[in-house]
Amino acid sequence: MKKKILASLLLSTVMVSQVAVLTTAHAETTDDKIAAQDNKISNLTAQQQEAQKQVDQIQEQVSAIQAEQSNLQAENDRLQAESKKLEGEITELSKNIVSRNQSLEKQARSAQTNGAVTSYINTIVNSKSITEAISRVAAMSEIVSANNKMLEQQKADKKAISEKQVANNDAINTVIANQQKLADDAQALTTKQAELKAAELSLAAEKATAEGEKASLLEQKAAAEAEARAAAVAEAAYKEKRASQQQSVLASANTNLTAQVQAVSESAAAPVRAKVRPTYSTNASSYPIGECTWGVKTLAPWAGDYWGNGAQWATSAAAAGFRTGSTPQVGAIACWNDGGYGHVAVVTAVESTTRIQVSESNYAGNRTIGNHRGWFNPTTTSEGFVTYIYAD
């Protein structure tokens, strides 16, 4: 009996000991899993924080580009309004200058014909009395004074139109530079937005707990990264194309009016002499490279340095003393005014007033200098009313 009791006690002790060992082992395994999970969560949190920093940095870059685009657009709106105002002021000053020139030329011809000194003496000699002589002399003095005031006003207006033309040209150049910067920023923005999307999807993939959702997000991330790479390739191609176009435009400037005229003639044409204007430079850099004004300045160096947009050239040329008209001539500058920026070109061949050829740049998007349209009617183009500026 004692042996059975002892055996039972020993069996119970062994069973309790085994249960205790199993319970302890199970507790240690669960703790290890919890610790491992905690470590995994901790690592994932750190990775998420790093990914969030990347997203924030790219978002700042995107916001900066968008802010710059907004500022550039606002500046362009302001400069275009300023250019429009200056255009009106230049036109008005040009009219005044041309009108005064006509008056001064008439007075000069009259003085040469009648003789100012002889007329002055005759006025005194033919007076019936000293009082009448004094009155006549006073009247002639007033006329001379008025002429002097007219000359001073003419000088002031010419100075004002020169300053406004420079300011207008600066505004136009800035607008064109801003437009190019906006185009560059648009390409950069596309790349940054694609990178942002990839970073956001990367963050979402790291936060995902379900394997199916994570796999889907990883596929989207790979697609977004491929899109970002494609955008970067497109941006590089855009820059390369732009550089190539710029080289073509600059290379097209290695020409002159004689070469352009000969290109459309069956036999070599006689050289066309440009009017020498010492006050103007032969450098076309005062106009944006590739614009129609730059092309004309390259072919016709006698043109002014700060004549504004193509639509403004006729009034600017008239104010500078150049002759303008409606009859095309080889070597003349054709100036179209469509109510906007307008267009200019150099005439290289003439059959009639409705059939000419020209050399130009920035026609139909082609920014190189050349004959881009052959024979055409200059009076029926979409570019507006045509006026010709003559070198002499």
Swiss-Prot record:
Its EC number is 3.2.1.-. It is a peripheral membrane protein. Lacks peptidoglycan-hydrolase activity in vitro, probably due to auto-inhibition by the CC domain. In the homodimer, interaction between the CC domain in one monomer and the hydrolase active site in the peptidase C51/CHAP domain in the other monomer probably mediates auto-inhibition of the hydrolase activity. Its main location: membrane. The keyword Transmembrane helix does not apply. Residues 1-27 form the signal peptide. GO terms for molecular function: hydrolase activity. PROSITE patterns: CHAP. Keywords: Cell membrane, Coiled coil, Hydrolase, Membrane, Secreted, Signal. Changing residue 292 to A: Abolishes peptidoglycan-hydrolase activity of the peptidase C51 domain. The keyword Cytoplasm does not apply. Residues 47-267 are annotated as: Interacts with large extracellular loop of FtsX. It is found in: Cell membrane; Cell septum; Secreted. Disruption phenotype: Non-viable. Residues 34-96, 191-227 form a coiled coil. Induction: Up-regulated in response to raised temperature or salt stress. Disulfide bonds: none annotated. Peptidoglycan-hydrolase activity. Required in maintaining normal growth and cellular morphology. Involved in splitting of the septum during cell division. Putative leucine-zipper in coiled-coil (CC) domain essential for function. CC domain probably acts to inhibit peptidoglycan-hydrolase activity of the peptidase C51/CHAP domain. Homodimer. Interacts (via N-terminal coiled coil domain) with FtsX (via large extracellular loop). This interaction directs PcsB to equatorial and septal sites of dividing cells. Interacts with FtsE. This is Peptidoglycan hydrolase PcsB.
